[in-house]
Structure formats: structure tokens, C-alpha cells
UniProtKB/Swiss-Prot annotation:
Family: Belongs to the class I-like SAM-binding methyltransferase superfamily. RNA methyltransferase RlmE family.
NCBIfam families per UniProt: PRK11188.1
Predominant location: cytoplasm
CDD domains on file: AdoMet_MTases (cd02440)
GO molecular function terms attached to this record: rRNA (uridine-2'-O-)-methyltransferase activity
Function: Specifically methylates the uridine in position 2552 of 23S rRNA at the 2'-O position of the ribose in the fully assembled 50S ribosomal subunit.
Source organism per UniProt: Shewanella sediminis (strain HAW-EB3)
Gene: rlmE
Identification of the protein by name: Ribosomal RNA large subunit methyltransferase E
UniProt-listed Enzyme Commission number(s): 2.1.1.166
Lineage: Bacteria, Pseudomonadati, Pseudomonadota, Gammaproteobacteria, Alteromonadales
Catalyzed reaction equations: uridine(2552) in 23S rRNA + S-adenosyl-L-methionine = 2'-O-methyluridine(2552) in 23S rRNA + S-adenosyl-L-homocysteine + H(+)
Length: 209
């Protein structure tokens, strides 16, 4: 029993140390959340965002991804962000607070996008977790389906999509849907993502109309 206790204790310590490292690093670099490192790592590998691009950031609060996106898109770019939670203003980011699952919020978001096509859709959305897989997974899959639907409505030809997905029921079917819509789809597990988490990021490039 003592061995098991030590193992559990050291696992906890490692996790806390890991979390603390990224939290401190985020504070040091002025990021609002440790999630900023996830999109930074994806950007480093996949080069999704370039100067002058228009980016939609879904599930944006507290703003870590938007901070990275607006810096990459530059003065001539545009970042439109949405979250059900409030978010303190970020210079260069057009933020809409509302529940993305509601039609009126989607309509308001589409109005902000306007007639111009979007170059990149980012989604770090996740439901409030209950701890019950049979409840959480369908909720999570519903959100990523909505994000993919957003791509179909606003994404420019050859546009890009990066979305957080939780592995489990519905994952393979969703992966198939993304592959049908994009030329290339890669699965990423950023270093800053907790090892025990079922989250992965699908990075899709080359949107096919």
C-alpha cells in the first residue's frame, strides 16, 4: 500500500509542478492563460496564421489564444473572438460575449465577419465538465461540430482550422468529417497539454469548398 501511496503522491507532485511551470511562464510572458502555449506550439509547427489574415477564435476567454493570434495577424489582420464568458479587452480583437450554441449569437458573429472570408478558425471550446463521460463527451462533440459548421460558413478556400477535441465516442466520425473538408489533417498534442487529458488538437489545412 505504501508504494501505491508514494506513486499517487509523486504523480500529483509532478502534475502540480508541470502546471505551476506553465502558469508561471504565462505570467512572465504576459499571457492570460497557459493555453497560449498550445496555440504557439501549433503555430510553430503548422504556420497557420500570417500577417494580414482574418482569424475567428471560438471559446476565447480569458484570451490566451487571441493574444497570440492578434500578434501574428498584425496591424493589417483581424481577430474576431467569441465566448460565453466575459473577456477583458485586447487591442485589435473584436470580442463578442454569448453562447455560440445560440442562433442569435452565431448570427451576431457572422455579422461581425461580414462578407469577407476568414483565413483561420480556431476553437478551444469545451463544455463545463460534470465528470460523467456519457454526458461530457456528447457535449464536447456538439461544440466541435458547431465549430466545423462555422468553417463551412466563413472559411476561405485553402483556409485553416485548429480545434480542441476530446478523444472518445464520436471522435473517429468527427475526424472523418474534417478530413472530407480539408486537404490535410494532423493530430497535435502540445507539450503544454496535460498528459492525462484526453484532449488533442486537430490541425486542418487546405479547406475544400
Amino acid at each position: 500500500m505504501s508504494g501505491k501511496k508514494r506513486t499517487a503522491s509523486s504523480s500529483r507532485w509532478m502534475q502540480e509542478h508541470f502546471d505551476d511551470h506553465y502558469v508561471k511562464l504565462a505570467q512572465k510572458r504576459g499571457f492570460r492563460s497557459r493555453a497560449a502555449f498550445k496555440i504557439e506550439e501549433i503555430q510553430e509547427k503548422d504556420k497557420l496564421i500570417r500577417p494580414g489574415m482574418t482569424v475567428v477564435d471560438l471559446g476565447a476567454a480569458p484570451g490566451g489564444w487571441s493574444q497570440v493570434a492578434v500578434k501574428l495577424a498584425g496591424d493589417n489582420g483581424k481577430v474576431i473572438a467569441c465566448d460565453i464568458l466575459p473577456m477583458d479587452p485586447i487591442v485589435g480583437v473584436d470580442f463578442l460575449q454569448g453562447d455560440f450554441r445560440e442562433e442569435k449569437v452565431l448570427d451576431a458573429l457572422l455579422t461581425r465577419v461580414g462578407d469577407a472570408k476568414v483565413d483561420v478558425v480556431l476553437s478551444d471550446m469545451a463544455p463545463n465538465m460534470s465528470g460523467t463521460g456519457g454526458v461530457d463527451q456528447p457535449r464536447a462533440m456538439y461544440l466541435v461540430e458547431l465549430a466545423l459548421d462555422m468553417c463551412h460558413q466563413v472559411l476561405a478556400p485553402n483556409g485553416c482550422f485548429a480545434v480542441k477535441v476530446f478523444q472518445g465516442e464520436g471522435f473517429e466520425e468527427y475526424m472523418k468529417s474534417v478530413r472530407e473538408a480539408f486537404k490535410t489533417v494532423k493530430t497535435r498534442k502540445p507539450d503544454s497539454s496535460r498528459a492525462r487529458s484526453r484532449e488533442v488538437y486537430l490541425v486542418a489545412t487546405g479547406y475544400k469548398l
